[in-house]
Amino acid sequence: MGPVALPTWLQPRYRKNAYLFIYYLIQFCGHSWIFTNMTVRFFSFGKDSMVDTFYAIGLVMQLCQSISLLELLHIYVGIESNHLLPRILQLTERIIVLFMVITSQEEVQEKYVVCVLFIFRNLLDMVRYTYSMLSVIGISYAVLTWFSQTLWMPIYPLCVLAEAFTIYQSLPYFESFGTYSTKLPFDLSFYFPYVLKIYLMMLFVGMYFTYNHLYSERRDILRVFPNKKKM
């Protein structure tokens, strides 16, 4: 008897693609809900909706961002083809700003810049996860491919600027309340605002590195895509 072929649903490649599709779908639904909620609230309540943006969508934003840490595992085990370091930089800046800066300071949560930051982030993620979700099942559209590989070019630097402004606005509150700052037994202390100021400078260094990586990735994808269409 010859070797017995496994059913399609048991084949490793099928299971990997099915898992990635479900993951991308969950992320797409989460970010779409956030973006739609923010849009509807803005047109319904105007600027007043921007003040309590975090209270309305913060929990879902935190959930989506926490789940996105799985992407590091995807790259590490090889089920997602991408470079690990750029993704670490992207996720690190998001985690720090969302959880350590915005979530820890209620006064910062009411700033307009938080609403702007969330709009930029979710717009990028909606398009990115749509493209990834369709790509993993072999569906590709030239317009969507171009859009997903181009939208980040103006939006990503704006995201970083919004993150930097959020950190800058949070500094007086960290200085006043002493959040995360600790007095040590000897003549030294851990003063968190200093850490934020250093990180604020490093943020733009990371942006330069990530931007170059994304641009190289865009160039490679758009170069290969016309050849796929011809085949």
Swiss-Prot record:
It catalyses: a very-long-chain (3R)-3-hydroxyacyl-CoA = a very-long-chain (2E)-enoyl-CoA + H2O; (3R)-hydroxyhexadecanoyl-CoA = (2E)-hexadecenoyl-CoA + H2O. GO terms for cellular component: endoplasmic reticulum; endoplasmic reticulum membrane. Residues 41-56, 134-135, 179-189 are lumenal. The active site is at residues 156, 163. GO terms for molecular function: 3-hydroxyacyl-CoA dehydratase activity; enzyme binding; very-long-chain (3R)-3-hydroxyacyl-CoA dehydratase activity. The chain crosses the membrane at residues 20-40, 57-77, 113-133, 136-156, 158-178, 190-210. InterPro entries: Tyr_Pase-like_PTPLA. Pathway: Lipid metabolism; fatty acid biosynthesis. GO terms for biological process: fatty acid elongation; sphingolipid biosynthetic process; very long-chain fatty acid biosynthetic process. It is an enzyme of class 4 (lyase). It is found in: Endoplasmic reticulum membrane. Keywords: Endoplasmic reticulum, Fatty acid biosynthesis, Fatty acid metabolism, Lipid biosynthesis, Lipid metabolism, Lyase, Membrane, Transmembrane, Transmembrane helix. Residues 1-19, 78-112, 157, 211-231 are cytoplasmic. Its EC number is 4.2.1.134. It is a multi-pass membrane protein. Catalyzes the third of the four reactions of the long-chain fatty acids elongation cycle. This endoplasmic reticulum-bound enzymatic process, allows the addition of two carbons to the chain of long- and very long-chain fatty acids/VLCFAs per cycle. This enzyme catalyzes the dehydration of the 3-hydroxyacyl-CoA intermediate into trans-2,3-enoyl-CoA, within each cycle of fatty acid elongation. Thereby, it participates in the production of VLCFAs of different chain lengths that are involved in multiple biological processes as precursors of membrane lipids and lipid mediators. This is Very-long-chain (3R)-3-hydroxyacyl-CoA dehydratase 4. It comes from Bos taurus.
